[in-house]
Amino acid sequence: MELFRNLWRRKLRSTLTITGIFMGIVALTTMGALAEHFNSLIAGGVTYFGGAIQVGDAKSGGSFGGGGFMALSKADELAKVDGVAAVSPGITVAAKPGDVNTVSFGLPDFISATDPNGEQYGAFKTQLTSGRRVQSDGEVELGSSMATEFNKKVGDTITLPKKPADAKPDFVTHDYTVVGILKQTLTEPDTGAFVTLHDAQTLLGDSLPAAIKTSVNPYQLAESMTVYGKPGVNLDNLADKINNEVTEVKATKPSVLVNSFKAGGAIFTAITTVAALLALVIGGLSVVNTMLMAVSERVREIGLKKAVGARTGNILREFVTESTLIGTIGGVLGFFVGWLITLVLGGSAGSGGLFLVTPRLTILSLGFAIILGAVAGVLPAFRAARMDPVIALRSVG
């Protein structure tokens, strides 16, 4: 009880000090949760793109964000390249297209062709929490976030793509039977709906501009190809071989994509570090100031304690404990409020969310606040502990 009594001798100063740590931990928690979510996406991307080669139309600059189309027949040519184990054509369309009034800070919902080869050859594998895999047209597997957003379970019917409020008269939707729900991955598949290649090609045809719809056969097209190598094959070398042997395509080396993902992760790690430093500067200096003032105001008390036998260690422990308590209170309150902020903002971030509060972040935030309080109290504690009791008693009339 004496600890709390000492803290509240100067209520305003203690409150401001706790507020300083509180603000720093709120920043650390929210920015850290943002970074944790982004890093989970990075980890999934590194695993997926590091285990396969992405191939796209050469004229559009390759597969990663090129936006072009390639002939489906290219899959057969790619499969004949020495070292290739399997080829999966890919098509992805928006699940909620065209609504300009929709604002989302998370990953967008999408519809994509299933990749049956991915489970056998790919490094990134998904699992089902219920149901089975897509086997025929008219069926769909839903990512965990998308299933929650649309409130769907196995056996339900889902209409995709979702018709926006500003849809044109020729906007087309299709009904699918939900046959499987994917286990949460904390990465891109969570916001996806996965259908057969034929159904994805149908959706691609629906999304084409009216001017070219009649002149293009979507069932002969793919947006990209995912190429899986045989065991032991160097994928970067295989990408070079594809570029040399197959015309009109551009194979991107897995190492290029992996490095781009890691670079993005480094940026968010830096953001978290800045938030931690902010907490250190604001909280640490405020604790040091408060404890130094406490020592100055309690000179006579310290002198009396030492005069009646209190040892240096007792005084040192008392002041370090007080500063640690300040850090703990500010840390707990800051983490709780930061967590609430992630819940509120996360609700407007689309089905994929925006924040991820992990056990690691919880330990980091609370541990940082407690250690900060303890370390910041060391200097004032030493000053108090080394005080001469005779001088201390004389300093106050």
Give the predicted meaning of each segment:
Residues 2-3, 10, 361, 365-397:
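C-terminal membrane-exit region of the final transmembrane helix in multipass inner-membrane proteins
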Residues 34, 38, 42-45, 264, ...:
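Juxtamembrane alpha-helical signal-transduction segment immediately C-terminal to a transmembrane helix
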